């Protein structure tokens, strides 16, 4: 007996270690390990604005975040209406930190966090999905990561106020009270399999419904006959009769068809007994459900109390799934035994035939299956019977009950954590697809400030790619401008100084270079001086894929490779414009120029600007003389009003002498604008090379004003 007890303890200890070893903490896995465990973990690429990009291993199966998303986009009917894959981007913000998740799943948020969808344009030109509202909020972070829409947007879609609490709508409990009781007792603290009920259980729904009433009646019947049945069982065990298997355990095992386990409870009030029994029964049933090995009988006939220390949260998912699949037949057999005396007699006859076989042979020859528990062993002594009934299932909280997800998404529980998942791709018309990011080089991990609640993450961090440098070959200056490239500053354009001719000392004019326009005698000595213009790009032929630049300060004309906007990595605060000669060039983004009489260009000698809810260009009449019936009808800028000398026309003659910018001289660095209230001087502040006009307007370079917005 002692040897058997020692063997049992060793096997149980090994089982405990094996169950613990199968626990996987996705948050602590590296990239390769996270990919290998994709049935439990999901590798998500996370982009931050002012930090390095990194990979995060989320504790949720990849099939919830990848397969379902791919299946939706594989539908040809939806594919025609669905936006690009970037519509699955979530922007998570807390205080000054912003992260982008390019997945349909996001971690659970705390009260200080918010998630939103970025828009490239303002709400006037953007559209949000149902359950979201658009808010104009402009953000252009200086330390933004390239091509990260969460760091650079004009507006955002945020959850609207009419968000209702989501009670995990995707969860579907197994049909039938029997299957539900089995699930509740085998998985008291783990709701992650509720969303995928077993298909075999659904096939047996009709049988479960058929026995639903029998379970309730039998539970009441068994509670009344507990004392008598227990005495019969004890008598059978002590006598060791050949028909010992005929007397079945009177405990109703509608939720537990495994090998009976020793109970150790005290007879107390029913409410207190249920609470204590629920906790202990949960731990014992977990051990049986999660065990990949058969449960050995208790050979020493003593209750084993050391198993209660096992944490119920560390059970194996596969074992509980197998147990749920294989229990229905056994449950139906146990229920049939209690339906009537006729069924009991039939069961006893079958058991009598089986009991004739020697127990030792059966014990040594038949090896129990991993997914099946061995038959009842009469050597186990049940000291007291539990008062718990199948209808009293353990109470466990659903994380989705406290979670709030916006319309268009639903709550998903995995690993005792709540996630908000999109039901279908949202209808975003403003999102632009992101280019595929190349695999960056690995660098030593820096400390990142993560803002997730109860998260301990080991991040596989990667360095961001080097940002492109601005040069005079990637920006465009006008023909009369020169590009200045100083150390520590971005290149800029300024007015080109007058060209200086190039002189050559030659012995005669015939030796002057081609293109020389002047040949004069040398006043200092013999020979001549040949004068020619500096060499320019018109005299240089570049090879294919290059272009020539000759307006770089202190740099001779040179060929540079063309810039392709679709393949280039655009610097922050810049956008790329295609060009036939240069291939493309960068233009700096700045705030939209506010339209006013100061920034609006009104072309024409008699044009002037009127501030009337917005600048408007109007034109004065060409005539400076108007005929009016009386002097009070003359314009405000009338200098004189005289009677009409023409006898044919009655009235007065209004002589107009308008003050205009033609007679106004503004201070230095200022320019004059004709308005309806007279000429005004404004400070020169606009440069078309680094400014943008609003839509339907173009920035026109002007020598006096520097630049102004002209309506298209």
UniProtKB/Swiss-Prot annotation:
Biased amino acid composition, Low complexity: 220-251, 270-281
Record field: compositional bias (Basic and acidic residues): 192-203, 352-364
Signal peptide (from-to): 1-21
Biased composition (Basic residues): 204-214
Amino acid composition bias (Polar residues), ranges on this chain: 254-269, 301-321, 386-395
GO annotations of cellular component type: extracellular region; spore wall
Follistatin-like domain mapped to chain residues: 399-421, 471-494, 596-618, 660-682, 687-710
Subcellular localization, as worded in the UniProt entry: Secreted
Keyword annotations from UniProtKB, A to Z: Glycoprotein, Repeat, Secreted, Signal
Entry keyword annotation includes Secreted: yes
Disulfide bonds: none
Keyword Repeat assigned: yes
Recorded superkingdom: Eukaryota
Glycosylated residues in this chain: 102, 217, 234, 369, 407, 505, 524, 566, 622
One record GO biological process: sporulation resulting in formation of a cellular spore
Region of interest (Disordered), residue spans: 181-400
Protein name listed in UniProt: Follistatin-like domain-containing protein DDB_G0289517
Organism this protein belongs to: Dictyostelium discoideum (Social amoeba)
